[in-house]
C-alpha cells in the first residue's frame, strides 16, 4: 500500500491519493467483515466438524452481504452530498478488490487446516505481487485513476480465480464437500463474536481516517496515510508471524498441552516486541 500511495501522489495529485487512502481503509473494513473471523476457527477445526463446502458457502454469504452493506453506505454518502460519483466508484471497486482476499482466505484456510500452508502462502504471494505490480504499472501509465482501479480489480479477480483453480482440483478430493445448511447457520452464529472483535479492531485502528473523511479534504487524508504507515506495517508483520502457528496452537489446545501453547504465546510476544522495536 505504501508504494502504491506514493506513486498515486506523484502520478496524479494528493486528492486521488487521499481517495485511495480512505477507499482502502473502507475496503479493509469490508474485507475483515466478509472474512467473519472464520479463518482462525477453520484452521483449528482439526477434527473436521464442518465441511469445506460449509465454510465456503458461509463465506459467499458474508461477501455478498458485505458488498450490499458497502453499496448502501456509498449511496447514503452520495445522497448526503459527501461523495461525488467518481469517489463512490473508486471506493466501490476498491471494496470489490479487497473481497478477493476474503474469498481466497477460505481456500487458503483449508490448505492450512490440511497442513499445506505452504500452498496458500505461495498462491497468495503470487497474487499479491501480481496485483501490486499491475497497479504500479497502471498508475505509471497515468490513465484516469478510476479506470486504473477498475482494471486492477478485474484483472486481480481473473488472476485469483486462476491461482485457486490451479490447486483446488487435487486438494478438494481430500475434503468433505457435503453442505448442511444447519451447519452453515451454526458457523455464522459461532463465528459472530470473532467477526465483531476483528471488525472492531480494524474500525478503531482506522477511526482517524473516517473522521478526516467527514471533516477535512482528501489531500489531508493522503498526508495522514503517510504518517500512519509504520503502524500499518507493524500490523501486517504481526499477522505474518502469527498466522502460520494458528493450527499448531489449535492442536495444543485440543491435546490440552498448555505448556506447549504457552511456549507459542511467549514466542509470539517476543517476535512482536522485536518487530516493534525495529
Region locations from a protein language model:
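Alpha-helical transmembrane segments of multi-pass membrane transporters/permeases
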Residues: 48-53, 92, 96, 110-136, ...
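Hydrophobic alpha-helical transmembrane segments
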Residues: 21-24, 84-95, 122-169, 228
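C-terminal transmembrane helix end/exit motif
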Residues: 39, 106-113, 117, 139-140, ...
Amino acid at each position: 500500500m505504501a508504494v502504491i500511495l506514493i506513486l498515486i501522489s506523484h502520478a496524479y495529485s494528493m486528492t486521488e491519493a487521499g481517495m485511495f487512502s480512505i477507499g482502502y481503509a473502507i475496503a479493509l473494513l469490508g474485507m475483515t467483515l466478509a472474512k467473519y473471523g472464520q479463518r482462525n476457527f477453520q484452521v483449528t477445526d482439526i477434527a473436521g466438524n464442518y465441511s469445506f463446502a460449509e465454510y465456503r458457502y458461509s463465506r459467499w454469504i458474508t461477501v455478498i452481504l458485505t458488498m450490499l452493506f458497502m453499496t448502501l453506505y456509498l449511496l447514503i454518502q452520495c445522497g448526503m452530498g459527501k461523495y461525488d460519483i467518481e469517489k463512490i466508484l473508486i471506493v466501490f471497486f476498491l471494496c470489490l478488490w479487497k473481497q478477493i482476499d476474503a474469498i481466497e482466505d477460505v481456500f487458503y484456510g483449508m490448505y492450512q487446516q490440511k497442513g499445506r500452508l505452504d500452498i496458500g502462502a505461495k498462491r497468495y504471494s503470487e497474487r499479491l505481487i501480481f496485483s501490486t505490480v499491475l497497479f504500479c504499472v497502471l498508475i505509471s501509465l497515468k490513465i484516469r485513476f478510476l479506470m486504473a482501479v477498475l482494471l486492477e480489480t478485474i484483472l486481480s479477480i481473473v488472476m485469483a480465480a486462476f491461482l485457486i483453480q490451479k490447486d483446488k482440483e487435487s486438494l478438494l478430493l481430500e475434503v468433505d464437500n457435503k453442505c448442511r445448511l444447519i451447519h452453515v447457520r451454526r458457523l455464522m452464529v459461532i463465528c459472530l463474536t470473532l467477526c465483531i472483535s476483528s471488525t472492531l479492531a480494524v474500525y478503531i485502528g482506522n477511526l482517524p481516517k473516517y473522521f478526516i473523511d467527514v471533516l477535512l479534504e482528501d489531500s489531508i487524508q493522503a498526508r495522514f496515510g503517510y504518517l500512519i504507515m509504520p503502524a500499518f506495517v507493524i500490523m501486517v508483520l504481526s499477522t505474518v508471524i502469527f498466522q502460520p502457528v494458528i493450527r499448531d496452537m489449535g492442536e495444543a489446545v485440543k491435546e490440552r498441552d498448555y505448556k506447549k501453547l504457552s511456549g507459542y504465546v511467549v514466542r509470539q510476544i517476543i517476535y512482536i516486541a522485536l518487530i516493534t522495536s525495529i
